[in-house]
Amino acid sequence: NTALYPLMGIEVGTTVHFPMTTQELQAALAKIGIDGKRYSEVFFTSFDSDVLGLYDHLYECENIDELNELGHALLEVRDKGGLETFEAALVLGNHTRSVKDLINLTQNLDLYRFYPDISDDEGLGRLYADELGTIDIPEHIQNYFDYEAYGRDVRINEGGVFAPGGYVSAVPEGFKEYYHGPQDIPPEHRIFAYPEKAEPVHSILAALKRFQEAPPAPKKDKAGPSHEER
């Protein structure tokens, strides 16, 4: 709730998950006192995502409907097996300056060449020379060929980068702008609507006070190793 911070010096907020429904959004807005009358503005204090690096490209005043559209677009990318390519494209850094760019990026992933598990110039050189056949190396000099230098030249010429999941580069031309702004969001993905009734501010503040004054929870014994730790 944007208004309560300068007035009272506290952040009154809640966590939401995209994509979401209008009903879920209204419940979240009501919880922090947003009714569209006395209080109507919201901002985001932080982002988190299973999509590696996505939160670095999101900002506090993002449009809620656009974030929801991005959420739906990313689900579609995931279902098509393209999340690693999208994550690598974020590292490449083209078309990542706004949510509008990110939505368009999800629809242009066919322009990106992504090779998983390629993490250095030598590996890239071997991939291009031995597997993709981009250069003919006579058999009698293969043991002396500088794959690292060749891979470096490939990377520089393509403008590619090594991302956490592999190597990525993009076709220089052909990126299309399918999404031009909120007017292009399908009706079923437009969720923003104020709730009919919001939680009174005094109730919110009382709940915060109770939380702040509550004794700390007792420490539990350390649990056994998680699945990831094993």
Residue ranges and their predicted role:
Residues T14, V42, G166, E228:
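A broad, low-specificity signal marking well-ordered, structured residues that form hydrophobic/aromatic
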Residues K31-N143, P172-V201:
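Mixed-charge (acidic/basic) macromolecular-recognition segments
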Residues N1-R38:
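N-terminal ordered "arm"
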Residues T22-L25, D121-E122, Y147:
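Alpha-helix initiation and N-capping motif
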Residues D146, V201-R230:
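Non-Sec secretion/translocation targeting segments of pathogen effectors
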Residues N1-L7, S46-S49, V168-V171:
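Short, flexible beta-strand-to-coil junctions
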Residues E148-N157, V161-P164, P172, Y179-G181:
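Short, surface-exposed polybasic-aromatic patches that bind anionic ligands, especially phosphate groups
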